[in-house]
Amino acid sequence: MRTMVLLGLAACATADQREEVHPTTPVAAPIPPVIVAPAPPPKPVIPSCVDDGKPYDLAVLKERVTFLASKELDGRAPDTDGDRTTRKLIADRFRCLGLTPAGSDYELPFDAGGKPTANVVGYIKGSDPDVADQIIYVGAHHDHEGKGHLGANDNASGIAGLLAVAQAVRQGEPPKRTIVFATFGGEELGMLGSYHLAAHPPEALPNAKVVQFINLDMIGTHNARGFVAAMGSLPKLASRPILDKIARKFPKISVAAGGRARGSDYEPLCKQGVPYVFFWTPDPKCYHETCDTADRLDYRAMADIAAVAGALTIEMANTDRDLAAARAKYGCGV
């Protein structure tokens, strides 16, 4: 209707009086809806290293194990993003605790069967001039098999325990002896990291001065019911009476002291005569299986086991017993 009126007016107008007709404004085509792809799941965040709370806090232990055994880290096999992220977490934590790097940095690189990786090593220098050159090692391997094998108990639990022990030592009085905290790569490939470190010790940490090795490997098995083996702590060794005394303070766990072990990172230094205590819980169902996940571990028992290991570390670092003479006499007891 409106179009017909406009045409009639245009026909009646003179040349000088023609009505100016504006073109019709074009109608914009409809904008197609924007399809937004769902956001990818957030990557796990490295737990903050700034905490001054209790070192054996259950929530912190669980947070660290959950992170280390996350699907994103995929089992922390050597030369993977999970391996590199794990080493960064450990090195950052050592840095925040004020540990001295064993080399130019905390990471000491080595080749794991053609795969570049690293051990992560920091230490607290002893405070007593008479025994400061003697060394207590606390070790745990940080790698696992990868490819869907997440390694919560083996050995995210040991790494979480080692970091807790390092915090406990740092929060206490300076130890008389030097305490080294070392996490190893390539353990699942044949203890490659610990053998490399034993063959190439940092200049500041000679093997001849190591008087005790404390190893944390698989300390969180959910069905161990509070049982932990403390292998290597034979009756004649200096660690045994100290461990027995500590164990009585933790009635909720059963510390099975004594016995010999094989197949973990204490082995290279044991072959050089260094005594060891190897904390371990059995895990027959999920050992090296995909069911070794963070949701099935016993964090309360893990906290107690880590606390026993921490107390042993501190007592061994401060004991008046002649640990160098004990090593010379008994070696690692095998």
Regions of interest found by a model, annotated:
Residues R76-K125:
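A non-catalytic alpha/beta surface segment that caps or lines the substrate-entry region
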Residues P47-P55, K71-D81, L108-D111, E145-N155, ...:
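Second-shell loop/turn segments in exported
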Residues P174, F184-D283, D298:
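Metal-dependent peptidase/peptidase-like ectodomains
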Residues K285-V334:
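His/Asp/Glu-rich mid-to-C-terminal helical/loop segments that flank catalytic regions of hydrolases
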Residues Y56, V60-E63, F67, D81-R93, ...:
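Extracytoplasmic/secreted proteins, especially bacterial periplasmic and envelope-associated proteins
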Residues G122, Q134, V138-M191, A309:
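Alpha-helical metal-binding/catalytic segments enriched in His/Glu/Asp
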Residues D16-I35:
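Short, low-complexity, disordered segments immediately C-terminal to signal peptides
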